[in-house]
Amino acid sequence: MRQAETARKTNETNISLTLEIDGEGKADIQTDVPFMTHMLDLFTKHGHFNLTVDAKGDTDVDDHHTTEDIGIVLGQMFKEALGDKKGIKRYGSSFVPMDETLAQVVVDLSNRPHLEMRAAFPSQKVGTFDTELVHEFLWKFALEARINLHVIVHYGTNTHHMIEAIFKAMARALDEATTIDPRVKGIPSTKGML
């Protein structure tokens, strides 16, 4: 079973997280950042993962540390749960529309972390959430999961819709990339390792 769990406590945040890659879309997300709670909930649903997150942080300062640290811990657990990556498809991509918005996410579970993001959010905030934290979360997730992550919002005018479409597309792309393909024998790389 491809799953991992951890607890991470710093002077800024306290996070417990359990991830099951081959799940049913079951989420139990409790964070001090309501918008991230919403994004993680739909990420779980659309990726068919099972995810439990309990995250508390110094949100009296701002949402940065909590959002960043959730990305770090989720990335670490994603990498751990994938194990040796034998038999996976490795690559995944998804287009997701949300009303006027169209987002595209492409991933390679390559062990070469990179984030390429093309998204111009028209608003700096969604509610109280700073939209610049989306990049921070995605970069930390990609870095710790050691994946190549490309995010493109082709168009859109509503910042909430744009971010939501990104998280849904990322979930669907990761679901595809982590799928076990019976045609893949061993590691999906000519190098013999990822």
UniProtKB/Swiss-Prot annotation:
Gene3D superfamilies: Imidazole glycerol phosphate dehydratase, domain 1. The keyword Nucleotidyltransferase does not apply. Its EC number is 4.2.1.19. It catalyses: D-erythro-1-(imidazol-4-yl)glycerol 3-phosphate = 3-(imidazol-4-yl)-2-oxopropyl phosphate + H2O. It comes from Bacillus pumilus (strain SAFR-032). It holds the Pfam family IGPD. SUPFAM superfamilies: Ribosomal protein S5 domain 2-like. It is an enzyme of class 4 (lyase). This is Imidazoleglycerol-phosphate dehydratase. One of its GO terms (biological process) is L-histidine biosynthetic process. Pathway: Amino-acid biosynthesis; L-histidine biosynthesis; L-histidine from 5-phospho-alpha-D-ribose 1-diphosphate: step 6/9.
